[in-house]
Swiss-Prot record:
Transmembrane segments: 337-357
Protein name: Transmembrane protein 130
Organism of this sequence: Mus musculus (Mouse)
Gene: Tmem130
Domain of life: Eukaryota
Ranges facing Cytoplasmic side: 358-419
PANTHER family: MELANOCYTE PROTEIN PMEL 17-RELATED (PTHR11861), TRANSMEMBRANE PROTEIN 130 (PTHR11861:SF10)
Regions annotated as coiled coil: none
Annotated localization: Golgi apparatus membrane
GO CC entries: Golgi membrane
Keyword Flavoprotein: no
Amino acid sequence: MAKATDVLVFWFACLLLLGPARVAAGLYNLSLTADGPATVGTEVTISASLEVKDNGSLPLPADTHLYRFHWIHTPLTLTAKNEKNLTSTIHVVGGVPGDFPISVWVTAVDCWVCQPLARSTLLLPIKESLVGNIVVTQNTSLSWPNSYITKRSLRLSFLLHDPSDFFKSASFFYRWDFGDGTLLITDNPVVYYNYSSPGTFTVKVRVVAEWEQIKPDTTKGTIQKTGDFSASLDLRESLQGIQILGPTLLQTFQKLTMNLNFFGSPPLHVCWGLKPQCLPLEDRECHAVLVTRTSFNLTHVFQDPGDYCFIFRAENAISKAHQYHRIQVWPSSFQPFVFAFPCATLITVLLVFLMYMTVRSAATQKDIVESPGATGLKCCCQVCCGSLFLDSPSEYLEIVRENHGLLPPLYKPVKTYNV
């Protein structure tokens, strides 16, 4: 009877614990953090903290001893574990490279059938090589990521990721490749370099770590770990100025072409405007253009004479520049309306000529109708061909005399004298 009573009491206690656990299930989160990735043989610290889902409106359990954290971390080797204030921390070491899942959940103490209050997982990468990264700094602040200024010193450093101080007794060597053909071997993780030309460069560093380790047979041996790291650098030139090539005197309705040369690295955000005076541009007066080269051509036609000023503003990721260009526009002696006068004159002349030719053709036809052709033929025949149709030369001469009354006689008359 006593045993039956004990069993009932035990199950009743479990149900009391199970009730709150079921009610609380789904109301909490487990925040899981780790200082990985890590190198094979180094120690990794993983922490799990119980948190409320609704940002603190629900209180955490008052008695932290009523709950337990359960971990699954195989095949990683557990080196230490501790729990405090609903936070559990473990230390593990990986013997082989790979990505290993870590799982943790929280349940009520002494109740394995209770539903977990919260659970969480993460993937821990273990690498054969060293773990770290390259840090590049310069005494400038640019808005473009990984962008730096040419002809200024760059500080490049390698930061080893070793939170457990596993490599504190190791010796390191660094082989730097700056991407422009320059190589440097040093035992210092920090170097300084100056790029003289703009462009995109990939800086690489090979890190070698060596240390002595006692083998199982009590002999010392040298252990070596290596790692290859790289970083992309975008070197840009500051915008030092704008060169404007173009005329300063112009006539109206004449096409103006200006060439702008930018002394700086593209891309460039260019803004230009036209004013009577050389004053800074407002945003509403700006004609924005994105220039991807170091030159830009601008064309414009002035319709009114006067004094004008072109205002140019350009900026890249490093700096800004302004430039002005004054120009005088004179009235043109060859205005566009002058084209209409010669065209109208030419058309008028053509019309007059056509009318003249038409009238002349009509008059000629009228003369031909009024003058019979037989008269002319008769005259021609009488004058030119008379000798062929007349019977004697005397008749021919008579006809000629009739037609040409002023012709002298062909023979003198014989004078007779009487004595």
